[in-house]
């Protein structure tokens, strides 16, 4: 009797956890879409001179995407800490702590960027900061959160079916953003439009035709896709650090040794 009660209680807890996770994933998808659409709509509606004159407006336009990034990395960190996984062996322990440190670093960079980026006057950089930047760093964040497993021994890309194609298109968004930076402003909007559309397609598909996750995320090609996503994420946040340092130096002369 007690064993049956314990089993039923465990199954109920697992179902409750799955329900909460599903609710969070839907909420996160909506937040990501809103963060991109809000930044793009604000840029297109308001006069460009207002960004240069109003630091609060610059703060508001980057607050949602960067907050979304910070919250998701902190949630991933919390999930790792609350999991029952106990790393065994030197390599697994190293990977476990490496990923936790990386998640903390990404969250801190996102939070600090909210403070630093509005300091710059955005003279001629309003499109870059309000549209190109979010469509550059949010896609890898999104894929790490929804399509990857960070548990050592199970590290890899986990999506299956048509979601794999959608994820590949999402992964192309930051690369397209980089390529289109020298182009005319109208072309730079392409990744910012494509990314939320892909998320919406994925969200609707998961609601009506759920595809599940791979039970074998450690297949070589899945590990390779995960590594590619991680590299793009590291590169994106390294650029954010570099940009923040340039802004601080230009504003306060921190690196001026003359």
From Swiss-Prot:
Family matches, as InterPro entries = UPF0328
Q: Which family does it belong to?
A: Belongs to the UPF0328 family.
Protein's recorded name: UPF0328 protein ECU07_0060
**Where does this protein come from, organism-wise?**
Encephalitozoon cuniculi (strain GB-M1)
